[in-house]
């Protein structure tokens, strides 16, 4: 486990879990096997989907600077971070930037609370202090805080 001061320098954190759905598990194994047997063929098969994703990301990069973060959303970021007891302002800055990026990737013209709610667990879960009296996971703690603070 890294020190909190180092974890705070990571912008986002994701939890990677093994899929529980059997069909999804089988599909993952099939795709991995297809790649192992024919990497070039696999890349060719997914080329169109990768190109579409790349274009979507490039479009988002171009539009991100035009998206203004409204004051009410900045206040929401600050309220959530304050309620979670995050140190410093890096959490608010990361939450604001990642929310803006997600909104741009979504192709919307306005940033809203839905974008914030989606991004908050990734931006905040690794910044939480451990609470020995609360055995819920950090993702759930962030979700609970969002509900309590933002409704």
Residue ranges and their predicted role:
Residues 10, 77, 99:
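Conserved RecA-like P-loop NTPase ATPase core
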Residues 66-77:
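Acidic catalytic patch
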Residues 78-90, 101-151:
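C-terminal engagement/docking regions of AAA+ P-loop ATPases
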Residues 1-2:
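Short, small-residue-biased leader/transition segments that mark boundaries at the very start
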Residues 5-20:
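A short helix-turn-beta junction within AAA+ P-loop NTPase domains corresponding to the substrate/partner-engaging
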Residues 8, 93-97:
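Short alpha-helical basic/polar micro-motif
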Residues 17-26, 32-34, 123:
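Conserved nucleotide-binding/hydrolysis micro-motifs of P-loop NTPases
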Residues 9, 27-66, 80-83:
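Conserved AAA+ ATPase "sensor/coupling" helix adjacent to the nucleotide-binding pocket
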């Amino acid at each position: 486990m890294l020190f909190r001061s180092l974890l705070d320098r990571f912008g986002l954190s994701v939890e990677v879990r093994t899929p529980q759905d059997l069909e999804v598990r089988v599909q993952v194994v099939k795709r991995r096997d297809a790649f192992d047997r024919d990497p070039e063929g696999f890349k060719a098969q997914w080329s169109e989907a990768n190109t579409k994703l790349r274009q979507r990301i490039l479009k988002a990069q171009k539009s991100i600077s035009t998206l203004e973060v409204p004051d009410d959303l900045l206040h929401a970021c600050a309220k959530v971070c304050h309620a979670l007891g995050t140190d410093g302002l890096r959490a608010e800055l990361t939450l604001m930037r990642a929310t803006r990026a997600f909104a741009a990737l979504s192709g919307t013209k306005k940033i809203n609370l839905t974008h914030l709610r989606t991004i908050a667990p990734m931006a905040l879960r690794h910044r939480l202090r451990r609470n020995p009296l609360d055995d819920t996971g950090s993702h759930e703690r962030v979700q609970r805080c969002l509900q309590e603070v933002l409704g």
